[in-house]
Amino acid sequence: MGDRSEVPGPARPGPPGIGPEGPLGQLLRRHRSPSPTRGGQEPRRVRRRVLVQQEEEVVSGSPSGPRGDRSEVPGPARPGPPGIGPEGPLGQLLRRHRSPSPTRGGQEPRRVRRRVLVQQEEEVVSGSPSGPRGDRSEVPGPARPGPPGIGPEGPLGQLLRRHRSPSPTRGGQEPRRVRRRVLVQQEEEVVSGSPSGPRGDRSEVPGPARPGPPGIGPEGPLGQLLRRHRSPSPTRGGQEPRRVRRRVLVQQEEEVVSGSPSGPRGDRSEVPGPARPGPPGIGPEGPLGQLLRRHRSPSPTRGGQEPRRVRRRVLVQQEEEVVSGSPSGPRGDRSEVPGPARPGPPGIGPEGPLGQLLRRHRSPSPTRGGQEPRRVRRRVLVQQEEEVVSGSPSGPRGDRSEVPGPARPGPPGIGPEGPLGQLLRRHRSPSPTRGGQEPRRVRRRVLVQQEEEVVSGSPSGPLRPRPQPPAQSLREWLLRISERFDPHPVATRRQSVYIEEEEDED
């Protein structure tokens, strides 16, 4: 929303003296710089797109296919031997407590995948005002007279208008354009409920209850204890397995132009047209004004500085994967696998006090005591292109004092015809060869690619500690234990640099 005072319509008169129609209001309105920087604030354009995609899969109902319980197939029952068959105490206990059903006690298996795509594009322009959005007082049209003395037509107003430097560098500040694109893609997968597979719990099938023997059956003290505390669900005590993958793509392009201002956006006082006389002594027609106008070096090199254009593109891609919660598949605690117990030596084996303590507190989950396994891959691609033009200035943008025409004599002593003026004109080398230097164009491209991968936390996959000789001391034994529970992160870095330089001489 622009300035409401610029919208055509009836003027809104303010109080006398301090309103927008007063002397101060007119002066501020004409000099408040309605340029795109709005008093130093850079123009900014931001575009942001967000795409959220969520996919959820729920499996419920009866297990499909002919892989169900054969006991449900119509036909004569097959009794097993007494005591150890499926109808015995142990068979009933195992059948009722293995609970491999997809609902695992009514909870349906659920898989949620969520993808979030955020794309943001930002463009910042600083330095030179772009296009016709400059100072409105420079637009051709009827002049708006201000109050005498302090208005834009007074001595101070004319001096400010002519010397406020409407050039693209705005008093030395280089024009800069930065474009930045950020692409964030995050994918999260959560698995809750029962492990997938059609091997349901037959005890949930409608039918008569099968009571077990007293004491050791599922209704006895041991059965109830196992059923409540063994928690063979994939959530391992309620914590759902979670896998998060996050990709961040940042692309930034920056262009800086230094040296000569491009195009006809230079100093307006150089444009052909009628001269605007200023007040005597301090205006552009005075001794100091003429000296500054002739020696401020409007050449493309701006006093020897070569025009330079730098374009820099940075591409950063980072991928992070975190796995938390329950280990998937058969990588859980081996002590939960059905089978005969393996007795160890007395005292220090898995059945001793220390073994039982370690087995219960060693946290066989992939987090290894809470530290989640994390894999981070980061790729950085930096491409920089630099172009430098030296030698002859291109086109008719050289020193205006070399253009054929009548000489403009300055005041005696300090003008261009005086001792100082002649000295400056002869040694500033405005010739196209700059004292013999040939015009040269150099283009240089640098491409740097860096890839870094850091793996911390629990090692993924079926990696197990390799057998090692027994520790020689307590310190070595403690060091091995600490490395097992807190592995050091492993970092891998790769870097490649590609430099291309092209030189063109005329």
Curated annotation (Swiss-Prot):
* UniProt entry keywords in alphabetical sequence: Activator, Host nucleus, Host-virus interaction, Phosphoprotein, Transcription, Transcription regulation
Q: What is its main location?
A: host cell
Its gene name is: EBNA-LP
Q: Which Pfam families match?
A: Herpes_LP (PF03363)
On assembly, the entry states: Homooligomer. Interacts with host SP100; this interaction is important for EBNA-LP coactivator activity. Interacts with host HAX1, ERR1 and HSPA2. Interacts with host PRKDC and AKAP8L; these interactions modulate the coactivator function of EBNA-LP.
What is any one of the record's Gene Ontology cellular component terms?
host cell nucleus
The record's subcellular locations are: Host nucleus
| UniProt modification remark | Phosphorylated by the cellular protein kinase cdc2.
Q: Where is the region Disordered?
A: 1-471
Task: Name which cysteines form disulfide bonds.
Answer: none
| Functional note | Plays an important role in the establishment of B-cell immortalization by acting as an EBNA2 coactivator. This transcriptional activation preferentially enhances the expression of the major viral protein LMP1. The interaction between EBNA-LP and host SP100 correlates with coactivation of EBNA2 and the relocalization of SP100 from PML nuclear bodies into nucleoplasm.
Q: Which residues carry this modification: Phosphoserine?
A: 35
InterPro entries assigned:
Herpes_LP
Query: Residue span of the signal peptide, if any?
Result: none
Q: Which family does it belong to?
A: Belongs to the lymphocryptovirus EBNA-LP family.
Highest taxon of source: Viruses
Which classification does the entry list for the species? Viruses, Duplodnaviria, Heunggongvirae, Peploviricota, Herviviricetes
Protein's name according to its UniProt entry: Epstein-Barr nuclear antigen leader protein
